């Protein structure tokens, strides 16, 4: 799986790259990310909106628990933006190496939740354009309107309403902090 040629990599969709990075990494993972103050602040803001969704019967859990077990799924892309220090960014073959390096061990971490199918939604990174350009979509903000838009993006998957955990990564590119997140659930419970 690690031997993907440049042309094949550049034709992958964002979802395919995530799936490939989950399946293709046998190496050890990076050290676990310790939540920053920004991550804790953001999850508090997200949970205010999430609770409203719960009361309205739109999600299964009253709040999301900050759990960085799935952070590699988004950090691998955040690191691409940080290393090239630009957004938007046209994906290159060297970006694939960053994605693989940063997502190593993700599949193993997700096994206890039922595997990669436990991932339920993501927000903060665009799907690649036809020219393979991706962008960080959401500048960091705990302001109510921005958080509501972000939560709506997280809920843009058929399994999103089942989410009980959230992993957050806040990449910094050209001095601006962005927010990215992935939600997931425990399929084994």
State each model region's role.
Residues 1-20:
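N-terminal secretory signal peptides and thylakoid transit peptides that target proteins
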Residues 96-189:
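A well-ordered secondary-structure block
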Residues 3-5, 27-36:
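Short, polar/proline-rich extracytoplasmic segments that appear immediately after membrane translocation
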Residues 32-109:
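Short, well-ordered surface patches within globular domains
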Residues 16, 77-81, 154-157:
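Alpha-helix boundary/capping residues
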Residues 23-24:
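C-terminal motif of bacterial Sec signal peptides marking the signal peptidase cleavage site
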């Amino acid at each position: 799986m690690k031997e993907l040629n440049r042309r094949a990599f550049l034709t992958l969709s964002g979802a395919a790259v995530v799936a490939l990075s989950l399946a293709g990494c046998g190496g050890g993972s990076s050290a676990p990310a310790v939540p920053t103050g920004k991550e804790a602040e953001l999850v508090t803001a997200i949970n205010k909106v999430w609770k409203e969704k719960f009361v309205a019967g739109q999600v299964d859990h009253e709040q999301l628990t900050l759990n960085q077990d799935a952070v590699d799924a988004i950090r691998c892309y955040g690191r691409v933006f940080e290393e090239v220090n630009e957004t938007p960014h046209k994906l290159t073959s060297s970006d694939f190496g960053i994605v693989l390096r940063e997502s190593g061990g993700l599949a193993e971490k997700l096994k206890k939740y039922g595997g990669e199918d436990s991932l339920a939604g993501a927000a903060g990174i665009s799907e690649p354009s036809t020219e393979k350009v991706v962008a960080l979509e959401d500048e960091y903000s705990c302001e109510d309107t921005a958080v509501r838009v972000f939560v709506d993006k997280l809920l843009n998957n058929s399994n999103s309403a089942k989410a009980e955990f959230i992993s957050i990564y806040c990449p910094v590119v050209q001095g601006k902090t962005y927010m990215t997140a992935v939600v997931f659930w425990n399929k084994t419970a």
